[in-house]
Amino acid sequence: MLKYFGTDGVRGVANQGLTPEMAFKLGRDGGYVLTKNKKDGEQAKVLVSRDTRISGQMLEYALISGLLSVGIEVLEVGVITTPGLSYLVRAQGADAGIQISASHNPVEDNGIKFFGSDGLKLSDEMEGEIEKLIDAEEDTLPRPSAEGLGTVTDFHEGSAKYLQFIENTIPEELDGIKVVIDGANGASSALISRLFADCGVDFTTIYTHPNGLNINDHCGATHTENLQKEVVKQGAQLGLAFDGDADRCIAVDENGNEVDGDHIMYVIGSYLAEHGRLKKDTIVTTVMSNLGFTKALEKEDLKNVRTQVGDRYVSEEMRAHGYNLGGEQSGHVIMSDYHNTGDGMLTGLHLMLVMKKTGKSLSELLKDFKDYPQCLVNVPVTDKKSWKEHQPILDVIAEVEKDMAGNGRVLVRPSGTQDLLRVMAEGPTQEETDAYVDRIVKVVEKEMGTNK
């Protein structure tokens, strides 16, 4: 298990857990690992960008200093979305990209996320190599003086290149659909109006005025309450909410109901399949996707492949087996015909394209998708990794699954960050589902609960 890197880069409270000193080390050590295979005399090139958090510039300058110290040429993109940086790394033929963002997390947090030359997140092995250098007793990396140092160049025109790329994936103007868009006061705030206007969309925006402190503050993909009200108030056909770095998209239908990533993938996937464009008739999701998603796909003779939690694992599965649509319930949707990572703005526009092409409202497109009631309980435990060694827990899970008789599912997994065991079930009614979870939770608490 890695010490600094989580499922989405290095994260922490800015200036406390994630300090400028740490950012410098990540720039120096990470930059070296990513570019050490360059031929002699060929200078490595790395793109650096950030979201709108007040701590972003502090960390950016420290990170860039680390990169420059090992002779790397830095292209400073400024504020842009995470998928925007991923695209630009490939488009510019850069050796790597580094985004400073904590995505949907509150403003106190920040993160540093690395991308390879392919625009994809790093492998666990490469992240481990960076960590070894960070923890080394002595810094033995090159320290050029004068001629061998790196330089910084502004690349703020990168935003325009990225927006043009997204616009080119839409074959026609998206007029006739009124949309309200929530930018989460994040990285997409300055981009939304330019992109959606160029695509002919009738739209209004909310939460697109970042001040460094208001990113994700009761807005964006994890807080859609105000967007839901605004869609109904304005009589709009659709609402779109992005998170702080706009790699997620959550929608709102014309009735003000939230539409998560499962539902968005179902709508887009069904349309692609109908036109023979869904590869292998399969959508890749994580184990967190609702059972109703799989049941809805089965009605259309489509398949669902599931991975462990994390969009990187969805992406790996898609690349390994040639699938072109996948994502997470949380709103990461990967449309690999266009992009190799989740992109909120791209997803939103393609959802609109399906609505326009079919002439149907979002609620009509989802009429055959019935969510199964879900219950999730987080149980504090003494050792989350050893839960499978407790036979009574395995037995009660098997008993519950037998009682479900194929009309429900159980998912038990340890938390990635806390000493918790997450017990989740889905079933035909909320009452039955709650009872299933309660049966399992009681055994978990008896076997390994902190209060047993």
Swiss-Prot record:
The modification Phosphoserine is found at S103. InterPro entries: A-D-PHexomutase_a/b/a-I (IPR005844), A-D-PHexomutase_a/b/a-I/II/III (IPR016055), A-D-PHexomutase_a/b/a-II (IPR005845), A-D-PHexomutase_a/b/a-III (IPR005846), A-D-PHexomutase_C (IPR005843), A-D-PHexomutase_C_sf (IPR036900), A-D-PHexomutase_CS (IPR016066), Alpha-D-phosphohexomutase_SF (IPR005841). It comes from the Bacteria. It comes from Lactobacillus acidophilus (strain ATCC 700396 / NCK56 / N2 / NCFM). The active site is at S103. It catalyses: alpha-D-glucosamine 1-phosphate = D-glucosamine 6-phosphate. Pfam families: PGM_PMM_I (PF02878), PGM_PMM_II (PF02879), PGM_PMM_III (PF02880), PGM_PMM_IV (PF00408). Keywords: Isomerase, Magnesium, Metal-binding, Phosphoprotein. The gene is glmM. Its cofactor is Mg(2+). Binds 1 Mg(2+) ion per subunit. Mg(2+) binds at S103, D243, D245, D247. The keyword Phosphoprotein applies. Belongs to the phosphohexose mutase family. This is Phosphoglucosamine mutase.
